[in-house]
Swiss-Prot record:
Its cofactor is Mn(2+); Mg(2+). Manganese or magnesium. Binds 1 divalent metal ion per monomer in the absence of substrate. May bind a second metal ion after substrate binding. CDD domains: RNase_HII_bacteria_HIII_like (cd06590), RNAse_HIII_N (cd14796). GO terms for cellular component: cytoplasm; ribonuclease H2 complex. PROSITE patterns: RNASE_H_2. InterPro entries: RNase_HII/HIII (IPR001352), RNase_HII/HIII_dom (IPR024567), RNase_HIII (IPR004641), RNase_HIII_N (IPR024568), RNaseH-like_sf (IPR012337), RNaseH_sf (IPR036397), TBP_dom_sf (IPR012295). This is Ribonuclease HIII. Endonuclease that specifically degrades the RNA of RNA-DNA hybrids. The lineage of its organism: Bacteria, Bacillati, Bacillota, Bacilli, Lactobacillales. One of its GO terms (biological process) is mismatch repair. Belongs to the RNase HII family. RnhC subfamily. It is found in: Cytoplasm.
Length: 293
């Protein structure tokens, strides 16, 4: 999904609104002055003066403000915040979310270091470069432990809304450190509509517009940095949990997880499983059935 952020003059904003006034729609986001639903695009006009255009027709409507596609360089030449999460697809281990602030002058350093999407790097490479990234790059890391995850899922949150809460909090805390991004990109895990819906229940908010983009870790180094740090945090948590229980906990949610889960269930009961795993996964029932054989 195309996403374009602009900061036009107030005169141009008013001209745009007058031209597309029939497309105005309500928005629950308190930082959005005007929201328009247009054919193949949505337009959010923020109180800060920035405009976020999203959808296949984003470039078409952005041209109203003088935007030209050839000028777009995937946002890499901007100081930006990128976020990503790791652990949402793994039965064992917590959920790690990281927001990282990267400026253009850091790009060469990051490329030479071999920064890329954590899914394309070996765990050994991640454990090697993550400490360097943590030291050199301004970031905010959050880890929701399995026990805390199980406590909030089904009560206040579901598997999607809990990620919205963590991404929002990571960005909020990073902004509190004084960074000034010209763009904020989230590696999309849900639609913009769903994100805004769940965001409404969060107390900590900020006025900066955000962009949810699929496969953002391959487009933005800031997202790639977050992906690496989050993967490192997840792996460290997985090791620590396994060490406390005396088991090597596998990543993912396959049959290996079912087998280890049944062993932990037999040794420690549901309390032990709740300590190290996300109980709403189907692996929990599969582990129980293994013990019944």
């Amino acid at each position: 999904m195309a996403s374009i952020t602009l900061t036009p003059s107030e005169k141009d904003i008013q001209a745009f609104l007058e031209h597309y006034q029939t497309s105005l729609a309500p928005s629950k986001n308190p930082y959005i002055r005007y929201f328009l639903k247009l054919p193949q695009a949505t337009v959010s006009i923020y109180t800060s003066g920035k405009i976020l255009l999203q959808g296949e027709g984003a470039e078409k409507y952005a041209s109203f403000f003088g935007y030209q596609a050839v000028e777009q360089t995937s946002g890499q030449n901007l100081p930006l915040i990128g976020t990503d999460e790791v652990g949402n697809g793994s039965y064992f281990g917590g959920l790690a979310v990281v927001a990282a602030f990267v400026t253009p002058d850091q790009h060469d350093f990051l490329r030479k270091l071999g920064v890329g999407d954590s899914k394309t790097l070996t765990d050994q490479k991640i454990r090697q470069i993550a400490p360097i990234l943590k030291e050199k790059i301004q970031h905010q890391a959050l880890l929701l432990s399995p026990s805390k995850y199980n406590e909030v899922i089904g009560d206040r949150y579901n598997a999607v809304s809990v990620k919205v809460a963590l991404h929002n909090q990571a960005i909020y805390l990073l902004l509190q450190k004084g960074v000034q991004p010209e763009k904020i990109v989230i590696d999309a895990f849900t639609s913009a509509k769903n994100y805004d819906k769940y965001l409404a229940q969060e107390a900590n908010r900020f006025s900066n517009p955000i962009s949810l983009e699929e496969k953002a870790e391959g487009k933005y180094l800031a997202v790639a940095v977050s992906s690496v740090i989050a993967r490192d945090l997840f792996l460290e948590n997985l090791e620590n949990l396994g060490r406390e229980l005396g088991y090597q906990l596998p990543s993912g949610a396959g049959t290996a997880s079912d087998k280890v889960a049944s062993q932990i269930l037999q040794a420690y009961g549901m309390q032990g499983l709740s300590f190290c795993a996300k109980l709403h996964f189907k692996n929990t029932e599969k582990a129980k059935k293994r013990l019944e054989r």
